[in-house]
């Protein structure tokens, strides 16, 4: 096997303008789904029952075609097909790393962006669990200097449907719904769910898309549907302080902070949002996070940059900064990407840093880099069309239009 397996699994399907305009039932709350059915003439006395049926088929059985809903009357299925969709996003490309990590490049409709947009989702299999890294925006506004995604301009927010669709598609591809099988040779947990954990650590800043992220995660953790434990869902933010308390209060998932520096002058460079919400405000918001305890610690992400933030003085500053916060500190060896000016800290220095933090009583695992060969690792996500120079991208888009609806 080569270092990177890149598999183009689909071409743009032929859509009519009418089909593109159909609203999706994915991402709607029960109340919104009921209102949508009511608007299409479903009798009031049937609404609750029909919503329960649809919820089960979409989120428990994982169907993406109304015709597969065998206990729904045929005339109801025809109405649903005519007015709604539950289709998955288009897979532009699926890449499989030599460590089993999978990265999907997904395409969604323009929705005001002027052209179809692309995002990436990453699946990381480990012993005992499988983690899906989900994107919340197309691009990012934060321009963190060490992050590849930060070099891509923000195009638009993802909808709740588009956020949830990443999870549904991953479970499809991994055989994680009833009566489904995974592709032969797929690396994943031997027992239990194939997707057991979600991290909102993909493209974008989740708290700059709070409402859609909230709706998607509440559906993902709904006990009558996808039924993920909230303790297995982690939302990562670079420090949008006003929304941190709301995240705990209204969503109730685990929190991770992209910290990366212990001094404001350095964090202003590495994570520019620090200029708006400096470290003191960020740490105070963390201390007030609802449900915070030794059993529900905040994870602080700290990318290790050679001769930038990896000294023992930085380690001492980190301990001082986090005093009084139940915390785990994830040390992340920097993942290189083309054009970056940063280097990864020497492994010996990373271990010294970790040992110092451990001796102060903080868990400080060193995150094993995953999917580096397919640019799927932390800080490397960036949609393929945005990596290209403008002329290449235009040529690529022209090819996509030319292939629109083409047969294999």
From Swiss-Prot:
Binds 1 [4Fe-4S] cluster. The cluster is coordinated with 3 cysteines and an exchangeable S-adenosyl-L-methionine. Disulfide bonds join 133-378. GO terms for molecular function: 4 iron, 4 sulfur cluster binding; metal ion binding; rRNA (adenine(2503)-C2-)-methyltransferase activity; rRNA binding; tRNA (adenine(37)-C2)-methyltransferase activity; tRNA binding. It is an enzyme of class 2 (transferase). The gene is rlmN. The active site is at 120 (proton acceptor), 378 (s-methylcysteine intermediate). Reaction proceeds by a ping-pong mechanism involving intermediate methylation of a conserved cysteine residue. Belongs to the radical SAM superfamily. RlmN family. It comes from Rhizobium leguminosarum bv. trifolii (strain WSM2304). [4Fe-4S] cluster binds at residues 140, 144, 147. S-adenosyl-L-methionine binds at residues 204-205, 236, 258-260, 335. Signal peptide: none annotated. This is Dual-specificity RNA methyltransferase RlmN. It is found in: Cytoplasm. SUPFAM superfamilies: Radical SAM enzymes. Residues 126-375 form the Radical SAM core domain. Its main location: cytoplasm.
């Amino acid at each position: 096997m080569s270092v990177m397996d890149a598999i183009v699994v689909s071409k743009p399907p032929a859509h009519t303008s009418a089909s593109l305009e159909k609203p999706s039932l994915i991402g709607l709350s029960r109340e919104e789904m009921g209102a949508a059915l009511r608007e299409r003439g479903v009798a009031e006395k049937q609404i609750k029952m029909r919503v329960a049926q649809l919820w089960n088929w979409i989120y428990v059985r994982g169907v993406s075609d109304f015709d597969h809903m065998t206990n729904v009357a045929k005339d109801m299925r025809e109405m649903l097909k005519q007015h709604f969709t539950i289709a998955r996003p288009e897979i532009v490309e699926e890449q499989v790393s030599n460590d089993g990590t999978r990265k999907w490049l997904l395409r969604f409709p323009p929705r005001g962006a002027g052209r179809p947009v692309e995002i990436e989702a990453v699946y990381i299999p480990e012993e005992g669990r499988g983690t899906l890294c989900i994107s919340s925006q197309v691009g990012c506004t934060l321009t963190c200097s060490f992050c590849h995604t930060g070099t891509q301009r923000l195009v638009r927010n993802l909808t709740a449907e588009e956020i949830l669709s990443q999870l549904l598609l991953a479970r499809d591809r991994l055989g994680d719904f009833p009566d489904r099988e995974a592709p032969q040779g797929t690396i994943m947990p031997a027992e239990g769910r194939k997707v057991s954990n979600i991290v909102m650590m993909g493209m974008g800043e989740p708290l700059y898309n709070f409402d859609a992220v909230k709706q998607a995660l509440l559906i993902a953790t709904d006990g009558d549907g996808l039924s993920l434990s909230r303790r297995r869902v982690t939302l990562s933010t670079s420090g949008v302080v006003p929304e941190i308390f709301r995240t705990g209060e209204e969503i109730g998932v685990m929190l991770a902070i992209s910290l990366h520096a212990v001094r404001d002058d350095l964090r202003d460079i590495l994570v520019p949002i620090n200029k708006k919400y400096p470290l003191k405000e960020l740490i105070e918001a963390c201390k007030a996070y609802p449900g915070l305890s030794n059993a529900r610690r905040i994870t602080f992400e700290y990318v290790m940059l050679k001769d930038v933030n990896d000294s023992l003085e930085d380690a001492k500053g980190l301990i001082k900064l986090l005093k009084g916060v139940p915390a785990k500190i994830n040390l992340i060896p920097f993942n290189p990407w083309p054009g970056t000016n940063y280097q990864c800290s020497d492994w010996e220095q990373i271990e010294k840093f970790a040992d110092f933090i451990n001796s102060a009583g903080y868990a400080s695992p060193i995150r094993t880099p995953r999917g580096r060969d397919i640019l799927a690792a932390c800080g490397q996500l960036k949609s393929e069309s945005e990596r290209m120079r403008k002329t290449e991208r235009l040529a690529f888009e022209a090819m996509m239009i030319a292939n629109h609806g083409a047969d294999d």
